[in-house]
Amino acid sequence: MAPIFRNYRFAIGAFAVIMLILLIKTSSIGPPSIARTVTPNASIPKTPEDISILPVNDEPGYLQDSKTEQNYPELADAVKSQTSQTCSEEHKYVIMIDAGSTGSRVHIYKFDVCTSPPTLLDEKFDMLEPGLSSFDTDSVGAANSLDPLLKVAMNYVPIKARSCTPVAVKATAGLRLLGDAKSSKILSAVRDHLEKDYPFPVVEGDGVSIMGGDEEGVFAWITTNYLLGNIGANGPKLPTAAVFDLGGGSTQIVFEPTFPINEKMVDGEHKFDLKFGDENYTLYQFSHLGYGLKEGRNKVNSVLVENALKDGKILKGDNTKTHQLSSPCLPPKVNATNEKVTLESKETYTIDFIGPDEPSGAQCRFLTDEILNKDAQCQSPPCSFNGVHQPSLVRTFKESNDIYIFSYFYDRTRPLGMPLSFTLNELNDLARIVCKGEETWNSVFSGIAGSLDELESDSHFCLDLSFQVSLLHTGYDIPLQRELRTGKKIANKEIGWCLGASLPLLKADNWKCKIQSA
């Protein structure tokens, strides 16, 4: 017999109603007679087991078998009543805007909320540049810059669903670096614009805010492991993947360490207890502000400028003109012009960096290692870099567990032909080859479509790849032979923190449907 209900709870409820209906029908015939005669071939009332009902349709409260509806209306009503009461609304939408350091991105998610956990059915994604932080004091301009993304949301979310589709704007490292006063004005203008000019309810409290680094990393971990099916699924607890995210202003690490019986994670801000579905997870997470890709570039270039100031090649305070300096993080014959370098003193110098006569990849790696401040005092061993405690990945994270590296890790490797899975040593080889320059490029990358154009149009590849190797190997202590996975999507869904941050918004705990004006 085809299954009647979506799950056994529907079956129990509906079966009770069916039996009540049959009992009422039977009682209306009158008390049974001892000498009651049954006429041959007479129509005998059917029991529920005799009735064949097709599965309930995807729409709650809809019965596919029209014959059953006609002949047994009470039974059909019972089925529809049970499904409707349990799940009155299948599809819900959530709008999440990621206001990053280099640009803003909108993710519009469509969920089936009749499953546990909710099933992600579809995602609409779009992005634009520049980021909110580039507007500096123009807070209204910053708010209006999101209009193209919100137009995408207006076109995607059905009209009837808009008033109950929450929207949140989460800014990351770029806006943090702008300072409290400027960032607060921008966020206030964004909230005001959303509330006045759009039909979507804005999430209360921290719905429009600068996201804490711990949240950013943990939400990315949730997204990744949710899409991989590692969390939220029925059955035994599964091993989870580690997540390393590299943005423009910061980098995050999140993983679930396992300790020997007599050990446990050291308490501190790095420890994050998470409940997802029926399982509890104790995660290590940390957001290294100032160690995103673009901040890493600036740190390396700052070392070169500071050295030039010490050597008298640049006079302190002489920042009204463009200076020329050689950089080991450029391949031979490659220049990086008009680079703005901001020192710790907040002084900014404009530099034209010139590539050396000979490849200097080793010297570049020395610089990218140096900025990690690996020798900083470690008050709670073991530490990764800059004095930050981190459980050893070698000791507490099995080699069979996946490591995923996202965002700029993907953006700087994929255009050069790297696969979606490679060892850290292979990434190290790529950095070494890129830093050698044009002659080597022509022999190595000629068969990879578009890669030579990428290298010739962007002078930062040598520095960026060297920094990534330093960050993963010297910083996080990942062995060179360890396999890494990367990508922009899992199961055709965008990777990042946004999905993980959107899942809690399916419960209207901190937002209310907007009242539609007449």
Swiss-Prot record:
Reaction equation(s) it catalyzes: GDP + H2O = GMP + phosphate + H(+)
EC number, as in UniProt: 3.6.1.42
UniProt entry keywords in alphabetical sequence: Glycoprotein, Golgi apparatus, Hydrolase, Membrane, Signal-anchor, Transmembrane, Transmembrane helix
Protein name: Guanosine-diphosphatase
Highest taxon of the lineage: Eukaryota
Family: Belongs to the GDA1/CD39 NTPase family.
GO MF: GDP phosphatase activity; ribonucleoside triphosphate phosphatase activity; UDP phosphatase activity
InterPro entries: GDA1_CD39_NTPase
Assembly and interaction partners: Homodimer.
